Amino acid sequence: HFQEFLEKEAHLSEDSRNSEAVRLMFEDAGDLITWMRHFPYFYETERQILVHAGIAEWGGKDWLCVTSEELMVGKRTVSRGAFYKDVIAGHISTAKISGNRIYDGIWHDGQSHYYLDGTTWRSGKIPVLEYDSETGKYREI
């Protein structure tokens, strides 16, 4: 279905493209998606918050109290700057964030934010961020 989607992609509006991608995903991986729906919307470690789209950072250390599930999966604005934990998210294309339409890697704001959405459906690459717990450093692999 991936090739079928790529062939249609150029002729579809963004909303139609998203709808078509969702339809094909359910057709190919419906059982997997149903299983994944039972997972929590975020994962938190001592140093990181991993979330699909983002959190309400204005809540500071109480971010979870003020962040809706809808925001965790649908946030469309990019957060930048220092936060008390690293926020690792996807959802927003790193090409869009970087201002480089062909960029497909991990984008880091130089402080607390890492964005991983490398537009895999187009690039064929899955950006992977590795964290070394001994050094506290990240690297793209």
Positions of predicted regions on the chain:
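Hydrophobic/aromatic beta-strand positions that recur at structurally equivalent sites within the blades
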Residues: 129-131
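Acidic, His/Gly-enriched loop-helix segments that form or flank divalent-metal centers
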Residues: 2-125, 134, 139
